Regions:
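Arg/Lys-rich, positively charged N-terminal/basic patches that mediate binding to nucleic acids
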Residues: 1-22
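Enriched for short, Lys/Arg-rich terminal
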Residues: 2-3, 19, 50-53, 58-79
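Residues that form or immediately flank small-molecule/cofactor binding pockets and catalytic motifs
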Residues: 8, 41-44, 71
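Short aromatic/hydrophobic contact patches that present stacked aromatics
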Residues: 12, 45-47, 54-56
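Short amphipathic alpha-helical/adjacent loop interface patches that line ligand
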Residues: 13, 17, 28, 32, ...
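A short, surface-exposed loop/turn module that caps and links secondary-structure elements
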Residues: 22-48, 76
Length: 79
């Protein structure tokens, strides 16, 4: 599977501390096996839990597109 990142996701990863970067990288690489859940009301949208963070992504044709990485409290307010 190929993984692509949005500008928002890259910005968040670059601003995160080393431990958070490592946890995000490991979780994203294991997306099919991770704690993922399909988001209701949005086609092809999923979320991955990484501690208190939520990785919002979509999957199409063996491509995983990481759309955003945000804290849990903000993740569900925006939907």
């Amino acid at each position: 599977m190929q993984i692509e990142y949005s500008k928002k996701a890259v910005k968040y990863i670059n601003s995160a501390d080393k431990l958070t970067k490592k946890r995000l990288k490991e979780a994203i690489e294991k997306i099919p096996l991770g704690d993922i859940k399909r988001l209701k009301g949005i086609n092809e949208a999923y979320r991955l839990r990484v501690g208190d963070l939520r990785v919002l992504f979509s999957m199409k044709n063996d491509i995983i597109y990481i759309e955003n990485i945000i804290p849990r409290g903000q993740a569900y307010k925006r939907l």
